[in-house]
């Protein structure tokens, strides 16, 4: 059973939509079956999927659910954990997010602090510090490029060479929660550097590539790849309809 007080300030929305946003990895079938059994309640009263909920309401969902943290490494100072694809790191812009990587981290160790992040639809390994000294040292290591983040993804080809590097600028559109690659600075655009290497041709003009976001801006890899005509398979924000079947993963 899941019992949850919706944070104040969360706007009104249908219960089913809120549940999908609050627990994004909860199987859709479990949510559908709970509503069919009338096992979803708002403030003690049974509700239907279209009934609305808002900040301050208490939501109860009778499902079997667990939210484990996949820990790869823990020496008491540093954690390496796996962020599943589809799990956001933190709550969204409306404050919705009962199950996030941060909530799982805090359940595992109350002092855990992430050293870097991944987009919600990207799965991979993240590092977290368990003490202040490790946290500051880790931030410095990323800032000074002593640690490299490498991604593997399937992207549309063909590529002009086996390896390459792109240097451009990235402009944010906060209202649409997107970014745009531009060739020149100005308007708040920040420099970006992306290195890429073709690992394998998979057929039908798809390639397995290794990507390194040297500058590590928000959505940098997805936007940069799409800008040069190599959208990542599964990218539902910057890719085309044909690319929305899988997701990228950080190794």
Regions found by a protein language model. Give the residues of each.
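Pseudouridine synthases involved in rRNA/tRNA modification
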Residues: 1-33, 186-190, 203-206, 214-251
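RNA pseudouridine synthases
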Residues: 1-176, 201
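A short, terminal or domain-edge coil/loop segment
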Residues: 93-99, 166-178, 206, 210-214, ...
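The conserved catalytic core of RNA pseudouridine synthases
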Residues: 111-139, 172-228, 250-251
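Short edge beta-strand segments in beta-sheet-rich domains
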Residues: 146-150, 165, 191, 245, ...
């Amino acid at each position: 059973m899941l019992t949850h007080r919706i944070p104040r300030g969360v706007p009104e929305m249908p219960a089913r939509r809120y549940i999908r946003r609050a627990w994004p990895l909860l199987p859709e079938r479990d949510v559908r079956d709970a509503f069919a059994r009338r096992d979803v309640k708002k403030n003690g009263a049974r509700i239907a999927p279209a009934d609305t909920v808002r900040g301050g309401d208490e939501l109860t969902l009778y499902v079997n659910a667990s939210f484990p943290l996949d820990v790869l490494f823990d020496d008491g100072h540093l954690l390496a954990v796996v962020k599943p694809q589809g799990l956001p790191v933190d709550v969204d812009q409306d404050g919705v997010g009962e199950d996030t990587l941060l909530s799982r981290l805090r359940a595992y160790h109350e002092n855990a602090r992430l050293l870097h992040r991944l987009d919600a639809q990207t799965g991979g390994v993240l590092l977290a510090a368990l003490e202040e000294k490790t946290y500051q040292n880790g931030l410095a290591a990323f800032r000074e490029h002593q640690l490299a983040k490498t991604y593997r993804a399937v992207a549309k080809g063909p590529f002009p060479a086996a390896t390459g590097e792109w240097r451009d600028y990235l402009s944010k559109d906060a209202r649409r929660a997107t970014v745009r690659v531009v060739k020149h600075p100005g308007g708040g655009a920040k420099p970006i550097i992306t290195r890429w290497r073709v690992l394998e041709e998979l057929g039908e003009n798809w390639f397995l590539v290794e990507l390194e976001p040297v500058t590590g801006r928000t959505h940098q890899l997805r936007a940069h790849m799409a800008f040069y005509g190599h959208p990542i398979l599964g990218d539902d924000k910057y890719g085309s309809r044909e690319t929305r079947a899988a997701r990228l993963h950080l190794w």
